[in-house]
Amino acid sequence: MKTGIITMLFVLYLPVTAFATTLRLSNDIDLLVLDGKKVSSSLLRGADSIELDNGPHQLVFRVEKTIRLSSHEERLYISPPLVISFNTQLISQVNFHLPHLETEREAAHFSTTPRLELLDGDAMPIPVKLDILAITSTAKIIDYETETERYNKADKRASLPQFATMMADDSTLLSGISELDAVPPQSQALTEQRLKYWFKQADPQTRNNFLQWAEKQPPS
């Protein structure tokens, strides 16, 4: 589990900058896509935060919260997928701040008119652009990465076009399979492809820092 989280962090955020921003995770937030790339919820489970570089970022997520019904029963409310874009320049910490979501009425209002804040380490609001990610696919399993790419290319309210093209997609990563070692099971293979891809993109100092850090980690 620890290895999975470590690998994911390295894959998503290289190259590492001297100034980083800590995104504090919330139990009420299901993070789906970060900066145009799919995030595995299983890898995030148990993590308190993730590190981002300073600059523009985009999250796609759902709010998942237990609410009370008029019958005094409880049920899990899951919001539509939301897109939020923001800039972490000169910001060291980002925290989610949700509105009051306890009743069925409040949940219904949030689904149609979502409002939430991102706060910095001093509890001051960070400028954001928030939107609902309208899903066009009719598939049972939604490819949120593809839907986010489509959204970013459509010049919507929270679109960041740079995340529609700057990240290599999985087909690109897997196209170089002949250069790699024997392929393990598919999910492992994809993680390994991403790790090798981003390692090659990093500058020599970042590569050296990562290798030194990795050597100190206990085996999984």
From Swiss-Prot:
The keyword Transit peptide does not apply. Pfam families: DUF2057. It comes from the Bacteria. The keyword Signal applies. Keywords: Signal. InterPro entries: UPF0319 (IPR018635). Residues 1-20 form the signal peptide. Belongs to the UPF0319 family. This is UPF0319 protein CKO_02102. The lineage of its organism: Bacteria, Pseudomonadati, Pseudomonadota, Gammaproteobacteria, Enterobacterales.
